[in-house]
Design a protein with these regions (language model features):
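An N-terminally focused, membrane-permeabilizing/fusogenic/translocator signature enriched
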Residues: 16-20
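Intrinsically disordered, low-complexity, charge-dense segments enriched in Lys/Arg
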Residues: 175-176
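Basic helix-extension-helix modules of the SAP/HeH family
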Residues: 10, 22-168
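Amphipathic alpha-helical repeat scaffolds of TPR domains
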Residues: 157-170, 180-184, 195-211, 219-224, ...
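Charge-rich, solvent-exposed alpha-helical interaction surfaces
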Residues: 3-6, 97, 115, 140, ...
Length: 228
């Protein structure tokens, strides 16, 4: 943990708040990309994992989707391609396949996989699928990466980010919109006299400045927070 992280005492990500299952219309409505927040995050998650199983709980409790059925819907809509893969299997499982086909079972995992590919028709094997994003899905993730950043951000919510983005008349960056949100939050904390929350907001501003590479102002924020 670096110097700034220790001083700012980082908190858990927003997406880990999966205990509140109250209905939130924001997560049920489509974003400008034509997908719900849950669908967009699920596409990003699939890009990172390649899986269609072992979904995190936040898909159901925070994003309010059934990840398994939603994943299947997105596949049918052409956001994913799928191919059988040996990479998810354990060494023991790979050796079992080799043994059944009377092939040598010695070697490291990469060697075992290569041996199977060279000697066995993997289409006939009962093995997992690996999902990859189509070009359309890749472009979608790139174009709307700011929403994904907002969902995983430690200091703002995706919902607040979306509202603030829609309220800004010019084309703002993710950093601009987040800074605007934090400034408004600091103002509300000051007006209400909630200086405990204000201190936390100032720390969030410092983290943001550090992430933006603005070290000078980040240090100023640290000093300002420490003196209050």
């Amino acid at each position: 943990m670096n110097f700034f992280s220790k001083l700012f005492n980082l908190k858990q990500n927003n997406h880990n708040r999966d205990t509140n299952s109250d209905c939130n219309n924001f997560y049920l409505n489509e974003l400008e990309c034509g997908l719900t927040p849950g669908q967009l995050i699920l596409i990003d998650w699939t890009q990172k994992t390649g899986r269609n199983y072992n979904f995190p709980r936040y898909f159901k409790y925070s994003l309010q989707i059934d990840p398994e059925s939603t994943h299947n819907q997105l596949y049918k809509l052409g956001y994913f391609t799928k191919n059988k893969t040996l990479s998810y299997l354990t060494v023991v499982e790979l050796k079992t396949i080799l043994s059944k086909h009377n092939l040598a079972t010695s070697g490291k995992k990469a060697e075992l996989i290569t041996r199977i590919i060279n000697n066995v028709n993997i289409d006939n094997l009962d093995i997992p699928f690996e999902f990859k994003l189509t070009k359309e899905a890749q472009n979608l993730i790139i174009e709307h990466s700011d929403y994904i950043k907002a969902y995983y951000d430690k200091d703002i919510t995706m919902e607040d980010y979306c509202k603030e983005k829609n309220n800004i008349s010019f084309k703002a960056t993710f950093g601009d919109i987040k800074w605007s949100l934090l400034n408004k939050q600091a103002h509300r904390n000051t007006v209400s006299g909630d200086f405990g929350c204000l201190s936390n907001t100032r720390k969030a501003q410092g983290r943001h400045l550090e992430q933006e590479g603005n070290i000078k102002h980040a240090l100023t924020q640290i000093i300002h927070t420490s003196l209050n």
